[in-house]
Amino acid sequence: MPKFYCDYCDTYLTHDSPSVRKTHCSGRKHKENVRDYYQKWMEEQAQSLIDKTTTAFQQGRIPPNLFSAPPLGGPMIPPPHPSMMGPPPPGMMPVGPPPGMRMPMGGHMPMMPGPPMMRPLPHPMMVPTRPVMPRPDR
């Protein structure tokens, strides 16, 4: 009879049946081994990302600080007007008024309605019913 091998636990089960696998997979040691396996995998992925970022930085492909302020005394360039930037990328909602529409006096955008709020479903209630009476034969 074929045996079932558990990669997480590095062990063979007594035999390959659904009940044996279910019992094994619901056990404390198996769950710990699965958790440890994925924890180790996540740490390896994080370390790989750190190494790639460090290598790219050392090769000069990443600037020293992406979010640095402009140098003191340097020119302050205002952000472009929203209508000058062109359409938003696909899947993004446009920000600001449509092209050709001016802002209202005071410079504030009117509040745009958001998606409708979902109300919580009412709790099911017991509906009183009359007892069913047997009908007399007609």
Curated annotation (Swiss-Prot):
Keyword Acetylation: yes
Highest taxon above the source species: Eukaryota
Keywords, sorted A to Z: Acetylation, Metal-binding, Nucleus, Phosphoprotein, Ribonucleoprotein, RNA-binding, Zinc, Zinc-finger
Record-listed N6-acetyllysine modification sites: K52
Positions where Phosphoserine occurs in the chain: S17
Region (Disordered): 62-99
RNA-binding is among the record's keywords: yes
Phosphotyrosine modifications at: Y8
InterPro entries for the chain: Matrin/U1-C_Znf_C2H2, Matrin/U1-like-C_Znf_C2H2, U1-CZ_Znf_C2H2, U1_snRNP-C, Znf_C2H2_sf
Chain intervals annotated as zinc finger (Matrin-type): 4-36
Localization terms from the record: Nucleus
Subunit structure: Component of the U1 snRNP. The U1 snRNP is composed of the U1 snRNA and the 7 core Sm proteins SNRPB, SNRPD1, SNRPD2, SNRPD3, SNRPE, SNRPF and SNRPG that assemble in a heptameric protein ring on the Sm site of the small nuclear RNA to form the core snRNP, and at least 3 U1 snRNP-specific proteins SNRNP70/U1-70K, SNRPA/U1-A and SNRPC/U1-C. SNRPC/U1-C interacts with U1 snRNA and the 5' splice-site region of the pre-mRNA. Interacts (via N-terminus) with TIA1 (via C-terminus); thereby promoting spliceosomal U1 snRNP recruitment to 5' splice sites.
Annotated function: Component of the spliceosomal U1 snRNP, which is essential for recognition of the pre-mRNA 5' splice-site and the subsequent assembly of the spliceosome. SNRPC/U1-C is directly involved in initial 5' splice-site recognition for both constitutive and regulated alternative splicing. The interaction with the 5' splice-site seems to precede base-pairing between the pre-mRNA and the U1 snRNA. Stimulates commitment or early (E) complex formation by stabilizing the base pairing of the 5' end of the U1 snRNA and the 5' splice-site region.
Family stated for the protein in its record: Belongs to the U1 small nuclear ribonucleoprotein C family.
Name the record gives this protein: U1 small nuclear ribonucleoprotein C
Gene that specifies this protein: SNRPC
